[in-house]
């Protein structure tokens, strides 16, 4: 099991008094469902799980009254014995909540009722062209937490590098002291591996278990294909080719010396006026993260 930094944030959320229902948002396949189910198993006696993408029929539960007693009755009818509702002992997981805006509206009523914790996950929340209904967002009654693929420190944990070693490395960098040669070479090796493997949990697990980069590459290609499928399925028709062109230009953007995003690399003569909204769609979907005013840290001895 991969150790993730968000675990600490989840525990802080659970232990905070009078907490709101939680929404974990992030790109597809960054580990939201796995970490949510793992956290629920370790911190609650009972877990009630609904997935609106895999089981679209469960959206009907939220089509009528959002009274909590009514919802728990309908969920029990849908799940049978797998649904155990015990006040303050049950957590309800609403996976892929972007597929059911009414379920997001229901978060307000779960908050006001107060008997059950609710954790929702979503990967396409707020993107233009997909289930747009601002009235469904319960402003003030939900807490949003963003999840990302593994960062380099989490990648180090996955490779068995303990906290003491990481603390020693950070101390050297902060105090501008030389990193011991053996540690320096190991970190260089791991940084190169991270640059190739990336931070998607499936790719990281495959690399750690097999060390086969061809398997990692296959997983990466499948993830990219799923992102492109989302662009075709969920973006507005007029935006689909523009969004896909923006996304496919990213390798060229990153491979040039000047890291500033250049719209002309998407297509000759392209302008921000034509493509800025499409680039924003890709960011809103959690696929990219903009870096403003990047600074070079090549002088650090990592």
Task: Specify the residue positions occupied by each region the protein language model found.
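Hydrophobic anchor at the beta1->P-loop junction of P-loop NTPases
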Residues: 24
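Pre-Walker A adenine-sensing motif
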Residues: 3-15
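Hydrophobic positions on the alpha1 helix immediately C-terminal to the Walker A/P-loop
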Residues: 35
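Short glycine-rich substrate-engagement loop in P-loop NTPases that contacts/grips substrate
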Residues: 57-84
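Conserved lysine of the Walker
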Residues: 32
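Structural recognition of the conserved hydrophobic beta-strand(s) that form the central parallel beta-sheet
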Residues: 117-123
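Short regulatory helix/loop adjacent to the ATP-binding pocket of P-loop NTPases
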Residues: 127-142
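Accessory nucleic acid-recognition modules appended to NTPase machines
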Residues: 209-300
